[in-house]
Regions:
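Internal intein/HINT superfamily modules and their associated LAGLIDADG
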Residues: 1-142
Length: 142
């Protein structure tokens, strides 16, 4: 891993902490041919903004998720094109592990996603990992 990659991850993690959205919730969903609702997980990360270059950097650096544009609706004349990066489920786990050392505002939600997929990592009452040690290791430059 080169230092530019680490810098890009740190930048994107900070951007995500301020501008991103974490969806981690259960909701009822019907399966085909069934009358009964089943609880289904929705696990997703998203960043939306009008700066295309930044969203392209996010998509290229993280190497997962989708990049697409959302034009303003007809009633929003004069508004800018919005660009969006999204990832979900196992890709969200991968990204959460990258963002975790840098997260502050969304740390709890990021840890929930990591715990959802890797519950055996922690003991009861512990954090996902030793926060101080992991942040030190992940932020050291080669």
């Amino acid at each position: 891993m080169n230092s530019n990659y680490k810098l890009d991850i740190a930048y994107i993690a900070g951007l995500f902490d301020g501008e991103g959205n974490v969806s981690y919730k259960k909701y009822p969903k019907k399966r085909k041919g069934s009358k009964k609702d089943y609880m289904t997980w929705n696990i997703r990360l998203e960043i939306s903004m009008t700066d295309k270059d930044v969203i392209e950097l996010v998509h290229e650096t993280l190497g997962c998720g989708t990049f697409h544009k959302k034009p303003p609706s007809k009633g929003q004349l004069g508004k800018k094109m919005q660009y969006r990066w999204r990832c979900g489920y196992r890709d969200a786990l991968h990204v959460c592990k990258l963002f975790w050392p840098y997260a502050t505002v969304k740390l709890h939600k990021i840890e929930q996603i990591i715990d959802h997929y890797e519950p055996d990592i922690q003991e009861l009452g512990d954090n996902v990992v030793d926060l101080e040690k992991e942040r030190f290791i992940r932020t050291q430059w080669p």
